A protein has these predicted regions:
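C-terminal transmembrane-bundle signature of multipass membrane proteins
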Residues: 190-242
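Membrane-helix boundary/juxtamembrane motif in polytopic membrane proteins
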Residues: 162-191
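Individual transmembrane alpha-helix segments
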Residues: 55-83
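N-terminal membrane topogenic signal
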Residues: 1-9, 178-185
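N-terminal signal-anchor transmembrane alpha helix
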Residues: 2-36
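Hydrophobic cores of alpha-helical transmembrane segments in multi-pass inner/ER membrane proteins
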Residues: 82-88, 149-161, 220-233
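Interfacial helix-loop-helix junctions of multi-pass membrane proteins
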Residues: 125-141, 207-211
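Interfacial segments of alpha-helical transmembrane regions
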Residues: 6-8, 92, 98-118
């Protein structure tokens, strides 16, 4: 359980690093996506790449913005390993170890979906680096769509952890106030999943609401914080080993 605590803590800190690295001017983007990094994830042509690199107040692509996006991709390789570990090793495996059949099924779905999302994310980062280098052999859109689809599905299935509360994670029983926050975390994950999938569908079908996709994933924030607290309480409650 101590390992889970440290993994979650590193994941949260790296997510903060990723958020800071993604800060920058709004760009012309694609279908309402103003964040340059996210806009690049859905680029499928040279004009899409140029729009993702062009601030909305400028006419030509910004070379400094291009270097920022390149740096984001290398940071993202670490982030992929971290979020896969959190969802697979902590959330998915905890549900699989539950005696309830429904929890085990949802746990396997979490593990499968986050694995597909992580693989697609790696390929997406590679495609972005190729596109920024002038290559046109593969486009980020081909991998960005499945990545976000399976990531949002993972969020939805992961909500089960906060409703079913398997003993491997919730060994220390939450108090009334904390219990309410745990349930709220499950609701947030389901809401983020639904909003993200809806935004992705609108983006693909009518080139609208692309700006919803990124913020929907931020709803994992409270659940992660609560898991950090819960894992800390769990290992603090363990009796000291006598030597």
């Amino acid at each position: 359980m101590k390992q889970h605590f440290y993994l979650l803590l590193v994941f949260a800190l790296w997510a903060l690093v990723m958020t800071m690295a993604s800060c920058g001017p709004k760009t012309k983007g694609k279908c309402g996506i103003a964040a340059s990094g996210l806009a690049m994830e859905f680029a499928s042509s040279v004009p899409d790449v140029n729009d993702a690199l062009t601030p909305e107040t400028e006419v030509h692509p910004d070379s400094v913005l291009k270097s920022h996006i390149i740096r984001q991709q290398y940071l993202d390789f670490v982030f992929i390993a971290l979020y896969w570990s959190v969802f697979f090793l902590i959330i998915g495996r905890s549900l699989i170890q539950s005696p309830a059949r429904t929890a085990r099924i949802l746990g396997w779905l979490v593990c499968v979906c986050i694995s597909v999302a992580a693989i697609a994310d790696v390929l997406e980062d590679v495609a972005i680096l190729i596109a920024l280098g002038g290559g046109q052999s593969i486009w980020p859109l081909w991998f960005g769509v499945p990545k976000w689809t399976f990531y949002f599905l993972t969020m939805g299935f992961s909500a089960a952890l906060f409703f079913l509360r398997p003993g491997s994670v919730f060994r220390v029983t939450p108090g009334p106030g904390f219990s309410l926050l745990v349930s709220a975390s499950g609701v947030l994950l389901m809401a983020g999943s639904a909003a993200g999938l809806a935004g992705l569908a609108m983006f693909l079908l009518s080139c609208k609401c692309g700006g919803i996709i990124g913020p929907s994933s931020f709803l994992t924030g409270l659940p992660v914080i609560l898991l950090i607290i819960q894992c800390f309480r769990n290992f603090r409650s363990q009796p000291a080993v006598r030597t």
